Amino acid sequence: MKQRLLALAMAAVMAMGLTACGGGGSSEGRTGDTMETYFFDFTVNSAYLTSDYAGRTPGEGNVLLVADITVKNTFEQSIEMYDTDFQVQWDDGDDAYAYPITTDMETYTEVEPVGENQLPGTYPMAVDEERSGELVYEVPSGFTDFSIAYLEQFVDDSGEESTGETFFVYFTAEDQTGASA
């Protein structure tokens, strides 16, 4: 997290005008909608549930959610993307969320992708670069309706953190587990 905040520090100087204007709202979309954040655009192209992803299997009572996304850097300089930018949620419970399996959330260390189309935990994006790939989450069985959320985060010159808009993309994942969810 600290590395992420440092990476955004330079961008935050330019973002001060935005945070001074309020921010803190939310936007929502559906599969195929392009969400336009301060730093990048992203689209959830499709999503499905599976019991196996490139040899990776979930723990008992869980399935894997595979979301195909496209990200485009629309900022005026290169940025570093993190898989933890994209949180998946399945209901309103306090613990009803997960981060991609490419980050160990107990140690905050990056884990190697297991699939060839899977986005890594961290990756650079040049100005106007666009990248598509899969985010893989371990989620409880029995759910097919999800949202992927992104929260804009800024750091000013003094190290003060603030947040901007939150973006939600709602979708129903196709069940490919072989069992009804």
Spell out what each predicted region is.
Residues 22-24:
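Bacterial signal peptide processing site
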Residues 72-129, 155-157, 171-175:
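The feature marks short-to-medium sequence segments in extracytoplasmic or secretory-pathway proteins
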Residues 17-20:
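C-terminal motif of bacterial Sec signal peptides marking the signal peptidase cleavage site
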